Amino acid sequence: MENLPFPLKLLSASSLNAPSSTPWVLDIFLTLVFALGFFFLLLPYLSYFRCDDPPSPSPGKRKCPVGRRRRPRGRMKNHSLRAGRECRRGLEETSDLLSQLQSLLGPHLDKGDFGQLSGPDPPGEVGERAPDGASQSSHEPMEDAAPILSLLASPDPQAKHPQDLASTPSPGPMTTSVSSLSASQPPEPSLPLEHPSPEPPALFPHPPHTPDPLACSLPPPKGFTAPPLRDSTLITPSHCDSVALPLGTVPQSLSPHEDLVASVPAISGLGGSNSHVSASSRWQETARTSCAFNSSVQQDHLSRHPPETCQMEAGSLFLLSSDGQNVVGIQVTETAKVNIWEEKENVGSFTNRMTPEKHLNSLRNLAKSLDAEQDTTNPKPFWNMGENSKQLPGPQKLSDPRLWQESFWKNYSQLFWGLPSLHSESLVANAWVTDRSYTLQSPPFLFNEMSNVCPIQRETTMSPLLFQAQPLSHLGPECQPFISSTPQFRPTPMAQAEAQAHLQSSFPVLSPAFPSLIQNTGVACPASQNKVQALSLPETQHPEWPLLRRQLEGRLALPSRVQKSQDVFSVSTPNLPQESLTSILPENFPVSPELRRQLEQHIKKWIIQHWGNLGRIQESLDLMQLQDESPGTSQAKGKPSPWQSSMSTGESSKEAQKVKFQLERDPCPHLGQILGETPQNLSRDMKSFPRKVLGVTSEELERNLRKPLRSDSGSDLLRCTERTHIENILKAHMGRNLGQTNEGLIPVRVRRSWLAVNQALPVSNTHVKTSNLAAPKSGKACVNTAQVLSFLEPCTQQGLGAHIVRFWAKHRWGLPLRVLKPIQCFKLEKVSSLSLTQLAGPSSATCESGAGSEVEVDMFLRKPPMASLRKQVLTKASDHMPESLLASSPAWKQFQRAPRGIPSWNDHEPLKPPPAGQEGRWPSKPLTYSLTGSTQQSRSLGAQSSKAGETREAVPQCRVPLETCMLANLQATSEDVHGFEAPGTSKSSLHPRVSVSQDPRKLCLMEEVVSEFEPGMATKSETQPQVCAAVVLLPDGQASVVPHASENLVSQVPQGHLQSMPTGNMRASQELHDLMAARRSKLVHEEPRKPNCQGSCKSQRPMFPPIHKSEKFRKPNLEKHEERLEGLRTPQLTPVRKTEDTHQDEGVQLLPSKKQPPSVSPFGENIKQIFQWIFSKKKSKPAPVTAESQKTVKNRSCVYSSSAEAQGLMTAVGQMLDEKMSLCHARHASKVNQHKQKFQAPVCGFPCNHRHLFYSEHGRILSYAASSQQATLKSQGCPNRDRQIRNQQPLKSVRCNNEQWGLRHPQILHPKKAVSPVSPPQHWPKTSGASSHHHHCPRHCLLWEGI
């Protein structure tokens, strides 16, 4: 005592005189230490602000502020390192000072009752912890220090065990200063379960001084990566009495030293892996060194103390008996000696101490200070341990006493931060454990009361799969804190079941570790058995049941019956015997029987909950099967029953309900069938139902319906209720369907089945008459199927049967025709080989009628229409024309007499000659010829009867295809028409073809007319619109061109111009002539197609079909244009009076007399009039005429005279068009004249300027429109107007017209240069290359100009 410093002497004296003065001394000392530590803490920051350079006048030297701003990190780092070194020195001094204080305070305390000390520590352990903690704490930075608890250390603080508390200093500053750890005032233990210390409660200022909690603790858990023990042996329970598990829970050992440590708040954020490794290494080394020395002392002490002394109130310094003090002293001394001996082996630097071995190095350094202290002061513990210290074995070599002077001031900083040995090891253990929450823990014990609670807060986060390894097994009635060195945790079956259910169940299940741990701890701790039993309720054992119940209650879509079954199941399942379950899992599946039971219950609950959906899926499958079966059953039995779907629905619902009730009555059936068959059946049905025929007949359905429901309980009441429910459902369904049928509605399911049947019907059956559609077998089948349901009323059955018969007849034959109509129309449009060029607008009435659809379907299938269909077509056509026309029209008679063997649409077959004796009736026969062979385009030359006026009135209203109009409007027809095909009913409809007479004269004239129209069709190849026209023989022998109106003037001018350009008219306008010449030159490639009438008629006859071939390439554009024109097409049957002989005087030459037959027949006269009318009607307008002009034409056609009113109207229209022509004439007159003079061809006699055509195209079109309309009016009875127009035309145009006619008819003007009659397709390539004047203008020059 003489060598101690003054403060220590004062403290020692005060402690000797009065133990109650210890708190006062401690308070003063702690205050000083706190001030010093705070100063050291602020020292780095104070040095940071020392850079206060005075301002210099030169701006270049003012760099200190900039340096501060630019180098704060480097300076702070330097200051931090300097402060760290100072802190380490302070910590070392503080540790030495604390060691002295603890050695002084210990011997002067009175002996206390040691009876309440549980789990006495071996003397070696006490001597091991203190020096380790002190030395380690002295070498650690200030940032790692912990709250001050060192003043309450054991009497031999340097002999305390440091390894049960990690010597890693806590990272943060001191947060608590424990001043209530004095000997006189016991501190109130603060033991939060979240941060409990692994040390037992300690009554001493220093950290847990008993080495046993860590020395004899279990080896590191599975997740604890620590170096193995050197002895590679585990400490058995007989070697130590306390356990310190690294999960942060308070161990079973209740050494009084550890209570204070438990009261210290745990500081998180300890060092990284280095601290962890060092903690684990100290833990293992301490366990190896201390338990070997203290096993005998520990066993002796345990034999003295009863189990009720397992708990001790913390803070009482006078409760230790002399025996306890002796034991503690022995333990501390032994530990210190062992540490001193190990310290001599390896003395590492400070850098080594910062490595994973820093804690061991600091422990050895601390042992040196303990040796020096024991050598100079001979310290003794304050429970009179000094007298037993001489019994301690081991070397007594002490370290250098200079440690007192070197570490005095370091002790202050260490006291400020607190000795980390107090709790750092426990914190390290917690840090290791928190990262691995699955590590097992031992249940803690409270220190102020008997332990009646088990640690369930931490254990709830533990993985349940680890419970199969390490249980707590030795917490017996004596509450001894022993844990088996080879723990075997045997989880309860419930824990295993819950664990597997949690992994495999689709429902959220609470952690099964909670109840399992409760049961385990309930077995270990007798005091907590009641609580465990209270918690071991069915809902606790099965935490998913309440959750499932809440989920089921919250599901609105879940049926009430399922909810009820779920409630019943959740209540009855816990009491079910296990033997009632049948294992549905594989036998080799590694689960316990309890787990199997849990899984089966869970699966059954899931099935109960989702069985409604499964039933609905099965019901939908049954419906799909029924719909798939209906076509086959309808063919076999006549018609599928509409009640099969409802019966199937009832069947599936019945099966689903049976399963539900069975599950409710017997919650634990054999689930193998449910799990195996239900999904397999569903998948098998999904794969096979399209090909599977539903094998449930009406009789089977009735038997299944009447058969009592299978039930394990055999409840008749339940069967009757279920049967009644199903019958009510069926009755309601049938009543609803019957009401719909009475109201004229069709049930949805019946409609679907009929649609399926109709889709399966062959198309060939669509031509059966409606009156014969209702098959008697189908009606019988319907009635029979209705009789199957015996619970239905007879009147209901009969009504349903009759309705089904009617509906079957109507739906089977009406709907397919209406559906097939647009389909066939679409196909006709897509298939070019079957599509025909449309020459007229469709008939709306015919298109909408079912007969028209049948005709169209028949045409698509290339089958001859039946007699009934022809009759229907005639009936539909008669709705839009006078009956007198139909009655007097031989065409309709011939159409009705048409044989079934109608020739197919062969484009290349030769035309059949008419019967003999029919040639004389040619004027009254419709002459049809085709210009495009591939598109079946036909043009008709028909005769018009005396009732042409009535016909014209009917034509604009009817708007049927051209051939139908011609058939309906031409009164006088020939009876030698060989084949009518079904008349078209849409835009793409087929057109009838009439054979052409084989008379040579007729053929010659026929081809001559064709030659006039053919170049107009060729303009389509140049992407120029076209107007179709029909040449009709008028009753008076004159010819009339029936132009078809187009949509715009641009598409009207070229075709109409070419069609109506006369040769004999010498008064055409200059612009009109230019446009005609340009169009003619464009069609130069069509010149060889100009038929020649010079040859014999027999040679001309085979030439006509090739003309059809030559027009193939023009089909696409022609079809498109014809579709545009048919909406506005209005046939004009214009009566043309025989004009004066002015045409003849002006050079118009018809066919020579040598080409006429010897006797001029009416046919020849009519042909002559045709050409006269064509050549005179040079400006007939192909565009749609105005309503006024149409009305005028119609009136003139009816009256067939030049009345004053008609002449006035025509004059007004002519004036309007003349004004338009005059405007365009002035604009293009000069260009046209220059153009004609420069490019006049010697043979053609008309210009071929390309650029002029493009630049003046618009003006020519306008001028042509005006002149064409005037010419039309002139030809219809305006001679004055015609004379005015002719006077205005230049003579040059007249000459060109004559030349053009000569070119067009070389046999007339140049009989010596006749061309041999060859087919145009074979001749035109040679002709195009023969003449040289065609090469300079291949696009616009044309020898054979058409109309």
UniProtKB/Swiss-Prot annotation:
GO terms for cellular component: membrane. Residues 198-211 have a biased composition (Pro residues). The keyword Repeat does not apply. Residues 1108-1127, 1137-1146 have a biased composition (Basic and acidic residues). InterPro entries: SPATA31 (IPR039509), SPATA31F3-like (IPR027970). It is found in: Membrane. Residues 60-82 have a biased composition (Basic residues). GO terms for biological process: cell differentiation; spermatogenesis. Residues 165-178, 627-651, 927-948 have a biased composition (Polar residues). The keyword Magnesium does not apply. Residues 55-87, 108-142, 154-235, 373-397, 627-658, 900-955, 1084-1161, 1313-1335 are annotated as: Disordered. It is a single-pass membrane protein. The chain crosses the membrane at residues 23-43. Keywords: Differentiation, Membrane, Spermatogenesis, Transmembrane, Transmembrane helix. PANTHER family: ACROSOME-SPECIFIC PROTEIN, SPERMATOGENESIS-ASSOCIATED PROTEIN 31A1-RELATED. May play a role in spermatogenesis. Belongs to the SPATA31 family. This is Spermatogenesis-associated protein 31A3. The lineage of its organism: Eukaryota, Metazoa, Chordata, Craniata, Vertebrata.
